Amino acid sequence: MYDTSGNYSVCDERPFPDPYLMQRVGWLRAEVARAERRGRLLRPGDEDEARRMPDPMPTPEAFALLGMFLGLFPPAVIFFRLFDYGFTPRHGLPIFLLCLGMNVVCFAVGRAMGAFVGRKIDGLWQRPWPLLLAASAALGLLWGVVTGGLGGAVFFGFGAPVGAAAAAPVGTLAFALFAPLHRLLARDGMIEARHAWPLVFGVTGLIAALIASPHVF
């Protein structure tokens, strides 16, 4: 059969594949493969234990708590050691306000960055332990650079590199400690709140104690 001009045969036409359909098929295949991999690697009974948790906490929320308190306590200890947090007459109100401003920024940014790290880590629970440790340390380093840099920027801008350099080892060590412990206690990506809170305060307290120790810094 030919068109009215007789130029080509309509019967020879073949339908072009729908690009959106191909995208959806590709996405579906990836999701199926991810679900199969997750099913193979989950510990027996993890899903049942997660459903039975009285107060489950998702991974991003647990890491957000860690980031929040890491942005609160370790910087406060540093400010006390350097400036007495502005509580002495020698430093006065301006130093106190600067320390408080930097602490507030670290607190807020630390929480946001902690949630970001948690979302990234959430996809790595079924990966090998060395990969989880390396990823958590690298993401902790990123947390420290961003949180410390923005917090230090309050100190007239030039405190940003100092803050980033000070917070980078804090984030690296804290998240490298927290991630494997969280993995041991979590079930299907969920951890009970009664386990998460002591874990957060334990890691944060350890970091703060190391900073406060004259034998370490």
Language model: regions and residue ranges:
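Juxtamembrane/disordered regions of integral membrane proteins
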Residues: 2-217
